[in-house]
Amino acid sequence: MKSPMNRLGIRPGFNKDDFKLIAQGGFGDGMNAYAHSMAWFNGHLYVATTRGNFPLMKARLPIGMDVWPVECPENPFSLDLQAEIWRYTVADDSWERVSKAPLIIGSHGKPITRELGYRGMVVYQPKPSDTPMLFVSTWSPAKGPGPLLLRSVDGRNFEPSCEPGLVGLPVTTIRTMVPFKGRLFTTPAGSRGGNTNVSAHSVVYESRDPANGQWEPVSDFGFGEAGNKTIFEMAGFEDHLYVGTFNLEGFQVWRSTVESKPPYQWEKIIDRGAYRGGLNQCVLSMYPFKGALYIGGGIQGGGVDTQNRVGPAPPELLRILPDGSWDLLVGEGRDTPVGRKEPLSGYLPGFDNFFCGYFWRMCAHDGWLYMGTFEWSSVLGYANRARWPEVFTGIINHLSPQSVLDNQSGFSLYRSHDGENWVPVTTNGMDNPYNMGLRTLVSSPQGLFIGTANPFGPKYMPLNGTRYIPNPRGGCEVFLAQGNAA
């Protein structure tokens, strides 16, 4: 049921109290850390997880922690890291696990999960008369065969639709998939070196027959610019496919009508992170809304790129108009080659929240644009600050980590009716400080679903604690706002 319009002719958006918790504790297993992808398909909600994010981070990334928030064995693969797909039925408020990644023999000759997680999920139906298909993009361990695109027509059986690595590429993960003009587009996102965000193959791929694994490249490597380390996000908007990159000098945004013969002609719309530079490192989210394409930025690693010594810095929000011009909505005012840009919302980067690392996902529902963030203050009390910038530690060292956790931590969810005026729905992870990020949002006939990133399970080390104890608030969560908005 839709809510009535107000005197301004606007249907009210959802508030915090409209959201009901429908899954918690990682579906009963705190190892399910991220509700990493989500889709509405054939009358059900599908949610796919990534497991054991903190143990995997410790094993592969140079992140300085005095103590890790959760138990991290020396070999993370001694844990159950087999990613899962869950299905929700609204009518009886029930969940069913419909898929679990199989164990295979890795390149080291030992059993290993085929998938650590599922970073993308999309419904593809090229023609109204065609049977809709659910595609899921996977994250493969480095000693696995490579990422796959899984395909299902019934929501229960998920079969590989391509060869490992999409077309045999030496990569570990595929993040984004976009149906556009009757075709499916995707791109690799991770390398064998352990970084899930930097690809050795920054190319857009297209398929007119993804069910049979027929893929071809339709762009030059990095659009001809070596600084584009990865094509990170894509979206269709009006007549163009838009692509956002990962670039240490600042992300770029390119677009193409994807017509004629590939490789298609591509036009650069935004350069050098909209002239903010490296603090706008990558495009995390893209979403079309009321005649514009909205662009959410960020810095890999949750806003602090320790590998490249970038950040910490909160993200900006932009929007691109059909003529290729752009507005700064949330961010730092500055002079640019296309004139002075001031944030039209009045908000500084991160909605005035220094600990905001990403503008992670966006979704339109019932006339409102909803935006979820990633917020990293929950790890502040565990981090080794020896290599942090002096200016930064001079501020942080005056803060109590417990006070920050109690009063600051948790993702934010904002909504806007016009892209310029933003209203907070929650700024504390829906009352759970361990909900670091809002990773998934899906609009459906039943309402708006949101899924969280919460790697603080199944056991965690309390701040100033001496041992790991069960965390009833650890593991990903899913919420539904249904019926009339408050």
Stretches found by the model and what they are:
Residues 2-33, 40, 44, 52-119, ...:
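Trp- and S/T/G-rich repeat-edge/linker motifs of beta-rich repeat architectures
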Residues 44-48, 133-137, 183-187, 240-244, ...:
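Conserved beta-propeller blade signature
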Residues 364:
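C-terminal substrate/ligand-recognition segments
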